[in-house]
Amino acid sequence: MAAGVPKIDALESLGNPLEDAKRAAAYRAVDENLKFDDHKIIGIGSGSTVVYVAERIGQYLHDPKFYEVASKFICIPTGFQSRNLILDNKLQLGSIEQYPRIDIAFDGADEVDENLQLIKGGGACLFQEKLVSTSAKTFIVVADSRKKSPKHLGKNWRQGVPIEIVPSSYVRVKNDLLEQLHAEKVDIRQGGSAKAGPVVTDNNNFIIDADFGEISDPRKLHREIKLLVGVVETGLFIDNASKAYFGNSDGSVEVTEK
């Protein structure tokens, strides 16, 4: 690694094992998958681990050896948070409308199963995240080791499958999820203490969280949910990820790939 881009094994601890794990996963994912000769359009996802993805890419701007190439990267955000991450790290901002074909995308996950199927959307950006990740030739997941399921989705992540819906369809979709798809519990996601009422996405939709317990066939469940009138998108990301990096608190990283 050239001077100016810190070596992973020489990094000082952040003083928080969980943050160390996230940083290790993100830095290694960027270093091993970002190809300077081939990648120009980069998708930047949402969430706490992706903070370190944007940070790592931004570090290449500070190295004279990489500056010329890194300054030409165009980064596509999945929402307001990732837009700010891109700008805060002095990276060039683009949009999915301008660049509908993305070379590589990095994003986090709420849970990853043994087949690299994902639950995403805990941050309420699932439609934009899926739009960016499925537009990318390569999609890399970065997360800490808590997000790795031993087998099925729904084992570790117990908040349910996030589903983005048209606001006026809330009652209809909730009833269909309970009666047709036998969800154990369905809740409309509420805003925090500073905001009364439901969470509103960047696309002015609502988010439902539907608990199906452990999900042995996420592909089938995704198809069934998508057929319900009023559903915009599900937080089940099927056959999308190429590779997942899981950071451990000791700084080591596990890699899962297809």
From Swiss-Prot:
Coiled coil: none annotated. One of its GO terms (molecular function) is ribose-5-phosphate isomerase activity. Its EC number is 5.3.1.6. It is an enzyme of class 5 (isomerase). This is Ribose-5-phosphate isomerase. Belongs to the ribose 5-phosphate isomerase family. It comes from the Eukaryota. CDD domains: RPI_A (cd01398). GO terms for biological process: D-ribose metabolic process; pentose-phosphate shunt; pentose-phosphate shunt, non-oxidative branch; pyridoxine biosynthetic process. Keywords: Isomerase. Pathway: Carbohydrate degradation; pentose phosphate pathway; D-ribose 5-phosphate from D-ribulose 5-phosphate (non-oxidative stage): step 1/1. GO terms for cellular component: cytoplasm; nucleus. It catalyses: aldehydo-D-ribose 5-phosphate = D-ribulose 5-phosphate. Present with 5680 molecules/cell in log phase SD medium.
